[in-house]
Amino acid sequence: MSNRPNNNPGGSLRRSQRNTAGAQPQDDSIGGRSCSSSSVVIVPQPEDPDRANTSEKQKTGQVPKKDNSRGVKRSASPDYNRTNSPSSAKKPKALQHTESPSETSKPHSKSKKRHLDQEPQLKSAPSPSTSKAHTRKSGAAAGSRSQKRKRTESSCIKSASVSEATGAEERSAKPTKLASKSAASAKAGCSTITDSSSAASTSSSSSAVASASSAVPPGARVKQGKDQNKARRSRSASSPSPRRSSREKEQSKTGGSSKFDWAARFSPKVSLPKTKLSLPGSSKSETSKPGPSGLQAKLASLRKSTKKRSESPPAELPSLRRSTRQKTTGSCASASRRGSGLGKRGAAEARRQEKMADPEGNQETVNSSAARTDETPQGAAGAVGMTTSGESESDDSEMGRLQALLEARGLPPHLFGPLGPRMSQLFHRTIGSGASSKAQQLLQGLQASDESQQLQAVIEMCQLLVMGNEETLGGFPVKSVVPALITLLQMEHNFDIMNHACRALTYMMEALPRSSAVVVDAIPVFLEKLQVIQCIDVAEQALTALEMLSRRHSKAILQAGGLADCLLYLEFFSINAQRNALAIAANCCQSITPDEFHFVADSLPLLTQRLTHQDKKSVESTCLCFARLVDNFQHEENLLQQVASKDLLTNVQQLLVVTPPILSSGMFIMVVRMFSLMCSNCPTLAVQLMKQNIAETLHFLLCGASNGSCQEQIDLVPRSPQELYELTSLICELMPCLPKEGIFAVDTMLKKGNAQNTDGAIWQWRDDRGLWHPYNRIDSRIIEQINEDTGTARAIQRKPNPLANTNTSGYSELKKDDARAQLMKEDPELAKSFIKTLFGVLYEVYSSSAGPAVRHKCLRAILRIIYFADAELLKDVLKNHAVSSHIASMLSSQDLKIVVGALQMAEILMQKLPDIFSVYFRREGVMHQVKHLAESESLLTSPPKACTNGSGSLGSTPSVNSGTATAATNASADLGSPSLQHSRDDSLDLSPQGRLSDVLKRKRLPKRGSRRPKYSPPRDDDKVDNQAKSPTTTQSPKSSFLASLNPKTWGRLSAQSNSNNIEPARTAGVSGLARAASKDTISNNREKIKGWIKEQAHKFVERYFSSENMDGSNPALNVLQRLCAATEQLNLQVDGGAECLVEIRSIVSESDVSSFEIQHSGFVKQLLLYLTSKSEKDAVSREIRLKRFLHVFFSSPLPGEEPIERVEPVGNAPLLALVHKMNNCLSQMEQFPVKVHDFPSGNGTGGSFSLNRGSQALKFFNTHQLKCQLQRHPDCANVKQWKGGPVKIDPLALVQAIERYLVVRGYGRVREDDEDSDDDGSDEEIDESLAAQFLNSGNVRHRLQFYIGEHLLPYNMTVYQAVRQFSIQAEDERESTDDESNPLGRAGIWTKTHTIWYKPVREDEESNKDCVGGKRGRAQTAPTKTSPRNAKKHDELWNDGVCPSVSNPLEVYLIPTAPENITFEDPSLDVILLLRVLHAVSRYWYYLYDNAMCKEIIPTSEFINSKLTAKANRQLQDPLVIMTGNIPTWLTELGKTCPFFFPFDTRQMLFYVTAFDRDRAMQRLLDTNPEINQSDSQDSRVAPRLDRKKRTVNREELLKQAESVMQDLGSSRAMLEIQYENEVGTGLGPTLEFYALVSQELQRADLGLWRGEEVTLSNPKGSQEGTKYIQNLQGLFALPFGRTAKPAHIAKVKMKFRFLGKLMAKAIMDFRLVDLPLGLPFYKWMLRQETSLTSHDLFDIDPVVARSVYHLEDIVRQKKRLEQDKSQTKESLQYALETLTMNGCSVEDLGLDFTLPGFPNIELKKGGKDIPVTIHNLEEYLRLVIFWALNEGVSRQFDSFRDGFESVFPLSHLQYFYPEELDQLLCGSKADTWDAKTLMECCRPDHGYTHDSRAVKFLFEILSSFDNEQQRLFLQFVTGSPRLPVGGFRSLNPPLTIVRKTFESTENPDDFLPSVMTCVNYLKLPDYSSLEIMREKLLMAAREGQQSFHLS
């Protein structure tokens, strides 16, 4: 889990803190995020942040590096010798080389420039020369072309002190081509607001360094508290640097003589003279080649160049920038990435230029990459403004001294800012030249003639390189050193020299990635070492070097025959070397062409065999290898057959079904996609797979193990939408292709995409790398502006449009003799079993999927099956499926593709099985829909409200006629074979550069993409030549903007289902002139399809249903008439008795009435009224109608005939049938939209690179900001007016972030009238006390409220959502779009400035503000017993014994209209309301009878609607929806009003998404779907940033300390983490144990909280010995208080209950479990259902009393019967009453009085002790007993409990759950036995164990035999909590991992106990010799190992 800390105290640093100085938790703030780091960061800065970023990068000539190579780490490491940081100077040396593991090991985005992306390259020991704040590359060495292209942007000096170019740069007056779109707005001064709670704002590695430089106008400085100062320390020393550790071996091998002298290495830097100036403007350390003549010369040259800069506005400049590098805390990182798109383009540009400047990586360019890590200097700190007032004084004095010096030399003061970075660079020059001069010396050593000298030199060279990075090795002579090392590498007789030379080359590529272009020359020599192995070490080292080279130069290796050489002696190598060899093979296959196949051919058998290997990494590389081959050869059928010849298909098939799975989710997707490609392009392979029984494999993958091929009930195993998509694609491709003519002719139109540009030519423009891109609207605008601003001209070209005349059919469909079709004819049995096995599964996938892509694919596969199956088989297959009703609902869809598919399916079925379907199509409404289509004028027009894309199209398919359908749907082609999925890349790209696999190789190209507007996101691949943009998208800037957001790496986005044609969406190149035409094309094409639908529908009716004289000859057709007649009888005005209900029952349960018939008979509305209406005019009262209904459907007694004995539920079958029919209706009618960003990711080279759905969009949010103008509301003049100009706001920041920003700057203070009418221009000071208050407290009183227009914004809404929903522009845009078509809003959202008004909160409004996510007041609670209006009742109760009557929960549900909290509209609303009533009746029916058993008639699980559940799950899996808080209203409203539609886990996720802040929602999502975060690229990660607060507690005083912890942190939004005094453990395990132990302490008998009996623990530890605990088998419930209880005692108990409320709420909020067995009535109180508690609830707290009450109630009922009996005389009645007895005793003889049973001191009414119970007051007595036990006696405790709970979050959020489910939410899963199979699936053996290991099998056998108590002990031992989360071991996160505990050879494992790491659920298990020993040791460890966390 992304941020679970482990036992390593330094290991808890988190992503957001990439460049914090490794701060250890300080003052309870974990992860280096100090408590005082403001979580909103808004810094007014004089310039647009994006531009700052851009210019910074332009000047650098380079780009933020985002990969694992060392450059990042170097520059991100702390400044060890900054003079202004006393702490760093004193750091012991050992610490200088450490780095927190969580820092180093973050996977970063991969860049094409540096392709070092595997774990070994994560190593990095901070180098001293990072010590300067990094300045920009420049100076004399800046002569490279990349520098010349820069332009001094004097008119917009960045952040007032972005350092400018050197004189050399200025003299090259050539202006840059990049100008900021937003420069104008920037001049007004923009600020940046980010929100630390924004989950998407994880700071990527590059962003971290960005925060190193920040410009903050003096007034805007955020003062930091002492916590942040404390955090200014070097990186955490808690764990050694991975780079060091991984190379210690090498260094130790070099022998004593070459021992590296750390002190000497660093001494020149560490012992700098005191006068060293640390310039404030500097922000990036740099070592270049030595400058001309030191400082003086430099100053002189700068003075000369001042003239050129002086036009910059002087006023802004003096605001000096401080480097906040060491102090940056987590929250600032959220802004640090925020260089918006332009910044990105600038960066991309720079990286491109440096590449062009010197591809060979010569000396000059090498150092130009020195500071690759610079990313958004302003974005981070400028935006964040985390500069500290707490910096050491020396800094200021030195700056002052420097300024004085410069002014004395005649330098104008305002140039001081720009000068800063240069100075720092100069210092570096003098120092840094050391490295390159050292290299020159060593070079001479390498070239010496003496071997010992050469060995010494090469060893030292290794050390220089292993410790160096691009900064420290500036000017390294790569071109000279490489040939020298290659020469040494050829000294066959000297293994030492060869080994070290090989190492040196490896380290060089790691330290200086661009050197790889030179190292390429060594490839032949490396390969020689592999062809003849003389020294295994040298060979393995050569493999490591080749692996690094292969990432960028795989072609060179391939063509040198390297692939075969690497695999030649594969088995001889160590496992790591084998992995390297296979990785090289995979990289070599990346862009292989058919001509190069011979290089691979001989190695294929070896690779195929490798698929059977156990090593996961090897297998994944091998899969990648084959996937790339198949992708690259997809059109070469003969090559595909060769690739697949040797057992490949069999081995891969086995690999897919191995349990537990070896393949990760991404790799699985890639392998299945590989199969699809093979089948679609080479049908003979499809036939081969069919013969290998692929159907069973697919069935297993979709449904798990099964018995028999055609089951009635199909349960799908949970799979991600992407996996489903690929599996259904494969099924589709295994069937022959559909024909091209007849009813399928329309497919070509669908395929072409509705947006085909049929012009013969398209226009393209050329970017700076010489790549051509099609024009689109946004690009066009931006390019024009840039060209104008910079005076640049661009080349454009006209090129034939490949789509104008392509044959639209896909390749696989061109095959005339499809082998698959042949097989269907020749081997009908095989075809039959295939179809039988998979049809039902496909059908189920279609029904249960919500994303459009999967559904389109399924529909296509089903069509193929139906078309090719014969009639008999079809009849057999279809008999179990309601095909007709599905076709009916598909026909009502808003998605054209679905409608077309439904018509085609109906046509085929009518041709093949006319007799059957002519009846069913009538009954199920297919006819009705087809006629509707045939007659409809405005075909398929969708209502103006949000797209109601019915069951067919959900998600990103918008209503088809909205005109803005995304490329994702309307432009997507046919749903058939993916034959061209990848080929389109080849067929259309101009150069190999555009090939898919290439793009993946150049992973981070987007950053260098064409110049793109700042609101157009970075593209994720460079094939922009025909970027996936269809003219659909060119209709509006927004859509084309979305298209640019959806590059094809999002998979077949534009072709999600689109397969058989050249990608339609590639017609992006629509020139401005063609735009209008393209609009016509779209509507034209859509009109054509609509025309086809109408015509086809007409023909269909004509052909099959013209003779409407079907005179009821088929009895099935009479059902509708019967139902209509019965419905008319349900009339409320006349009493029709129960006959009509009986008729309805028989129709529902005996005939198979269809959903269509139920809808069209009016039955739903009528039954709803019948059950709910309560009007005067009703002939029969509602109660009687309800009892009649229950009598008919459930055999309860008729009204007036209730028996004396209890009424028990008898048969529920008819009611169950009715519920199922209603659910079917709901599924068919509902049209709830799903906002899914359903971009099946991936590309032929798949797997590890497939970007997860939505992650691109998240990256977009992370890099773009909204520009907002804050304005004081015109209605108020008593707060300050904002004068700071527009601010830039993180789109995912919450509205309350803006409030925090303004309030801490004093804008929340309401002025008195006599104060100044407006603000003086004084600098805004930040009120520290307010800032601290905001940071530390969860419950800050809101002071300001915000409006957009008239709309008041909720505090917990994201700013993006607010702008999107309420801004005026949004109103205009909404006409043409909706959420589904574009998650990111139109481009306008990102370019316009939005006005947000603020005004103070009025006192009266303050009390009832909305409160969510930490900023909440107490939610409104129901009036409790103590409120004044109940005072009179109290007296009645006490004096007269009158208690309130029990409320009937059924009343609330019995309403014929939608309750007020349902605001959505949907065709299925009546069905939903009826189901809601039926559920309430089933659940609460017993309230209608006074003697009924309290049992549900139908279990709630029977009401679950699978279709709604699928939609909800799909919605809740979408990270983008959760990040933006954009959950559709229907989902939240249904979740609360009709929770029964969804299973518990869906509602639990919905609860976490709506109840808490976004970060928790994201965390929950990641816990349940870990694959979301598997994406490799750091910036597409969606890691939440949850604050953590650590507290240390003492076990001896646990309860007391827990109370104070909850008092302090209960309402804080930070996650609470616990550590115990004198124990080393910290993190998840101790925290879980804390909740479990506190739960136990609260059950202590001496606290007097609970009813129950006292017991002692069976296995007490420590303070538990001798302590009594309360046990109640039914569940705990509060002990009642009487009226006379002591106030002090009451107060004490109330305090404990208040604490319990806080504890439980905090546990829910932090995803923790408590271990409290609470009773059901307790949970009813939590949900405010206490007024409906009855005598039945007594059974849940005290069964003994409950049974007595039960008998006495029978006596009361008999008494009532006697009294109602008219035949009784007074005497006989008296006599009869006296004979009423209980167990033979009369009531009087029982000796009861009016006190509470079991509590003689609690009187039920005044003087109750003295009032005996008689037969006459028995009823009053029973009522009082129940009321006191369940209500009156415990109300004060529960009021306190609810108060405590609501101080954390409102109880109203728990409405998603039923009382009986709260136990699961709070305490986890119910105890049940563990079976070995489940354990095997859920637990992970590792580090020495596999599933086949003896010890693992023993363990599973032992665990499955544990009883409940042993299970609890084991769980507490291993995880810290005695309960598992809901879902058992499956839901345990991280999963239980069993690792082997190793011993010395002399030790016997049987003598040792197992140990655990609770934070990661690791069980370290010795390999015991027998099962008995293991059981004994496990139980002993579990008993003895409780309650202590020490190092094992």
UniProtKB/Swiss-Prot annotation:
Residue positions, PTM Phosphothreonine: T1377
Subcellular location: Nucleus, Nucleoplasm
Enzyme Commission number: 2.3.2.26
Compositional bias of kind Basic and acidic residues: 48-70, 346-358, 1017-1026
Positions of the HECT domain: 1885-1992
Basic residues biased stretches: 1001-1014
Primary location recorded for the protein, binned into one broad class: nucleus
Pathway: Protein modification; protein ubiquitination
Signal sequence interval, chain numbering: none
Ranges of residues in domain WWE: 749-836
A Gene Ontology BP annotation from the UniProt entry: ubiquitin-dependent protein catabolic process
Active site: C1959 (glycyl thioester intermediate)
InterPro entries assigned to the protein according to its UniProt record, in alphabetical order: ARM-like, ARM-type_fold, HECT_dom, Hect_E3_ubiquitin_ligase, HECTD1/TRIP12-like, WWE_dom, WWE_dom_sf
The reaction(s) this protein catalyses: S-ubiquitinyl-[E2 ubiquitin-conjugating enzyme]-L-cysteine + [acceptor protein]-L-lysine = [E2 ubiquitin-conjugating enzyme]-L-cysteine + N(6)-ubiquitinyl-[acceptor protein]-L-lysine
Compositional bias segments (type: Low complexity): 29-43, 175-188, 196-215, 330-339, 961-973, 1029-1040
Phosphoserine PTM sites in chain numbering: 12, 77, 85, 100, 310, 312, 942, 991, 997, 1016, 1030, 1317, 1322, 1329, 1376, 1427
Gene3D superfamilies registered for this protein in UniProt: Hect, E3 ligase catalytic domain, Hect, E3 ligase catalytic domains, Leucine-rich Repeat Variant
Matching SUPFAM superfamilies: ARM repeat, Hect, E3 ligase catalytic domain, WWE domain
Spans annotated as Disordered: 1-398, 938-1044, 1407-1434, 1568-1587
Protein family per UniProt: Belongs to the UPL family. K-HECT subfamily.
The protein's role, per its UniProt record: E3 ubiquitin-protein ligase involved in ubiquitin fusion degradation (UFD) pathway and regulation of DNA repair. Part of the ubiquitin fusion degradation (UFD) pathway, a process that mediates ubiquitination of protein at their N-terminus, regardless of the presence of lysine residues in target proteins.
Protein name: E3 ubiquitin-protein ligase TRIP12
Source organism of the structure: Bos taurus
Protein's gene: TRIP12
